[in-house]
Amino acid sequence: MIDNRKNVSNKFLCCSFCGKNQNEVKKLIAGMSVYICDECVILCNNIVQEEKKQLEFSLYENMYLPKPCEIFNYLNSYVIGQETAKKILSVSVYNHYKKLKNLKSNNKVELGKSNVLLIGPTGSGKTLLAETLARFLKVPFIISDATTLTEAGYVGEDVENVIQRLLNKCDFDIKKAQHGIIYIDEIDKISRKSDNPSITRDVSGEGVQQALLKLIEGTISAVPKKGGRKHPQQEFFHVDTTNILFICGGAFSGLNKIIEQRVLVKNSIGFNVDINNKLNINNKKNFLSQVQPEDLIKFGLIPEFVGRLPIISVLKELNISELIEILIQPKNALVKQYKLLFNLEGVELEFNENALISIAKESLHKKTGARGLRSIIEHILLDTMYSLPSKKNVQKIVINDGVILRKEKPLFIFN
């Protein structure tokens, strides 16, 4: 019988790379007339990883990384209010890209990801903040709606399609995609549907959280080159999500009550107090600002998912004065946009102060926040924009509060 540790000529097998024989190494892997030992496999892997790091570093080596105050000031140009949220995002994004810029560092301490969770009502500026950040940093950016996502194999959009869309955004440049920003909206809508995680298969709730968890914490995602569902015959792009920054946002309706219950119970322990009186004292208090991970878990997010979103920022509901500022102040303010639109017709458009107040009040009443401002203006200007191109010698159009409150027609001033 031939010793299985020797070849036919009774000689020891040797690694084709380092020359060590099979007795000097733990394992020898055979190929087409060549062999490689376990030590050389590890060495080759280290070389590949080092080259990968060098490539990633070269992307950001010469990149100018704006300081948190510069990011904050840029956000201020487009987003009104939400000072705390802007500051939190500025620092988080700065730290994230500072980490990428210093990938070449030999520091043994591994820096974690600064993924962010934005909590706030509809129209408070969550999506706008994320969009403005990506535009300023000039990195690939997409918005995904969590309500359309399902587990792989079920009807709906696979979670990994989010990465497919990011690749599309940067013309399938994998290196760019691996340093982009993904904003997942309506994240509160994928909360667990039951307190009992095993009661039923929750493919659009806990199942999606589990699938997103892998992407957010960092994994190699296999994305079909032609998009669509995966099948064995497809070719794939392999995207490392480790350095993709994830920002999740949601209104989290009902979370306020969960926090309120925790805070009031905690404050009442050991004291003979009337909970109802306590509630009356605190009824104007914004409990959302006191949110803790335990509250999000009780709301329906799984603990592992909450743990991957270490930075939580709460956005408050916009008031009337802030809504008026949104109408007139930012670089791309709505009033400025409509004035430009009318200027293209050779007509000056004017909103008086009372009109702006009425628009802001209506948006506040409808609870649509800044998002509802455009639809209100579009509605009151619809007939005017329809008839204006057919009118001659129009010099100016004035919008007053009567147009909003009493459905009056705008004032036309002719040459």
From Swiss-Prot:
<dbReference type="InterPro" id="IPR027417">
    <property type="entry name" value="P-loop_NTPase"/>
</dbReference>
<dbReference type="InterPro" id="IPR038366">
    <property type="entry name" value="Znf_CppX_C4_sf"/>
</dbReference>
<dbReference type="InterPro" id="IPR003959">
    <property type="entry name" value="ATPase_AAA_core"/>
</dbReference>
<dbReference type="GO" id="GO:0051082">
    <property type="term" value="F:unfolded protein binding"/>
</dbReference>
<dbReference type="GO" id="GO:0051301">
    <property type="term" value="P:cell division"/>
</dbReference>
<dbReference type="InterPro" id="IPR003593">
    <property type="entry name" value="AAA+_ATPase"/>
</dbReference>
<feature type="binding site">
    <location>
        <position position="15"/>
    </location>
    <ligand>
        <name>Zn(2+)</name>
    </ligand>
</feature>
<keyword id="KW-0479">Metal-binding</keyword>
<dbReference type="GO" id="GO:0005524">
    <property type="term" value="F:ATP binding"/>
</dbReference>
<feature type="domain" description="ClpX-type ZB">
    <location>
        <begin position="3"/>
        <end position="56"/>
    </location>
</feature>
<comment type="subunit">
    <text>Component of the ClpX-ClpP complex. Forms a hexameric ring that, in the presence of ATP, binds to fourteen ClpP subunits assembled into a disk-like structure with a central cavity, resembling the structure of eukaryotic proteasomes.</text>
</comment>
<dbReference type="GO" id="GO:0016887">
    <property type="term" value="F:ATP hydrolysis activity"/>
</dbReference>
<comment type="similarity">
    <text>Belongs to the ClpX chaperone family.</text>
</comment>
<comment type="function">
    <text>ATP-dependent specificity component of the Clp protease. It directs the protease to specific substrates. Can perform chaperone functions in the absence of ClpP.</text>
</comment>
<dbReference type="InterPro" id="IPR010603">
    <property type="entry name" value="Znf_CppX_C4"/>
</dbReference>
<keyword id="KW-0547">Nucleotide-binding</keyword>
<keyword id="KW-0862">Zinc</keyword>
<dbReference type="GO" id="GO:0008270">
    <property type="term" value="F:zinc ion binding"/>
</dbReference>
<dbReference type="Pfam" id="PF10431">
    <property type="entry name" value="ClpB_D2-small"/>
</dbReference>
<feature type="binding site">
    <location>
        <position position="37"/>
    </location>
    <ligand>
        <name>Zn(2+)</name>
    </ligand>
</feature>
<dbReference type="GO" id="GO:0046983">
    <property type="term" value="F:protein dimerization activity"/>
</dbReference>
<dbReference type="InterPro" id="IPR019489">
    <property type="entry name" value="Clp_ATPase_C"/>
</dbReference>
<dbReference type="InterPro" id="IPR050052">
    <property type="entry name" value="ATP-dep_Clp_protease_ClpX"/>
</dbReference>
<keyword id="KW-0143">Chaperone</keyword>
<feature type="binding site">
    <location>
        <begin position="121"/>
        <end position="128"/>
    </location>
    <ligand>
        <name>ATP</name>
    </ligand>
</feature>
<keyword id="KW-0067">ATP-binding</keyword>
<dbReference type="InterPro" id="IPR046425">
    <property type="entry name" value="ClpX_bact"/>
</dbReference>
<protein>
    <recommendedName>
        <fullName>ATP-dependent Clp protease ATP-binding subunit ClpX</fullName>
    </recommendedName>
</protein>
<feature type="binding site">
    <location>
        <position position="18"/>
    </location>
    <ligand>
        <name>Zn(2+)</name>
    </ligand>
</feature>
<dbReference type="GO" id="GO:0140662">
    <property type="term" value="F:ATP-dependent protein folding chaperone"/>
</dbReference>
<dbReference type="Pfam" id="PF06689">
    <property type="entry name" value="zf-C4_ClpX"/>
</dbReference>
<feature type="binding site">
    <location>
        <position position="40"/>
    </location>
    <ligand>
        <name>Zn(2+)</name>
    </ligand>
</feature>
<dbReference type="GO" id="GO:0051603">
    <property type="term" value="P:proteolysis involved in protein catabolic process"/>
</dbReference>
<dbReference type="Pfam" id="PF07724">
    <property type="entry name" value="AAA_2"/>
</dbReference>
<dbReference type="InterPro" id="IPR004487">
    <property type="entry name" value="Clp_protease_ATP-bd_su_ClpX"/>
</dbReference>
<dbReference type="GO" id="GO:0009376">
    <property type="term" value="C:HslUV protease complex"/>
</dbReference>
